[in-house]
Amino acid sequence: LNAYFCQFYLSRPYPDLIVTNRIINVFSEEKLEKHHIVPLGSVSNIGQSSAELRNDKSNILNSPLNYIYVTDITNKEVSSKSLSEYQEMIVEEARASLNIVNYPIVKDLSDHDKIKSWLLERHKNVKGEIQKRVTKLLSS
């Protein structure tokens, strides 16, 4: 299911997460990687490695709604950032194009209630985008 959400966004051009002039689409020449919008990279403060979290499919952070494609360059650039630094790096154009509105301001990744609330809001936005696209396709 993660791949379907990523592919839905990939079906139309969107700006890279942190660099506006890096456009991502199906024809991107840069290597693309799946990326957690709420990243796993700063998990040391809850005693779990990012590899452990990645493998825990029941963890809320592995929700399909928490994935997008970014360039490998961007993935490397943000991987070592704290959550607060990472949140500041996301450009407005990417937030709008990828339905990353009201990004959850969390101190650490154990704040599951805030993350869940944000994922539910993103679900509503993504669902609306899909319905709009399907309606447009059916009416043409």
Language-model features: locations:
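Aromatic-lined ligand-binding clefts that engage carbohydrates, nucleic acids, or primary amines
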Residues: L1-I37, G41-S42
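Short conserved micro-motifs at the rims of enzyme active sites and ligand-binding pockets
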Residues: V43-I46, V78-E85, S110, L138
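Short Cys/His-centered divalent metal-binding micro-motifs
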Residues: I60-E92
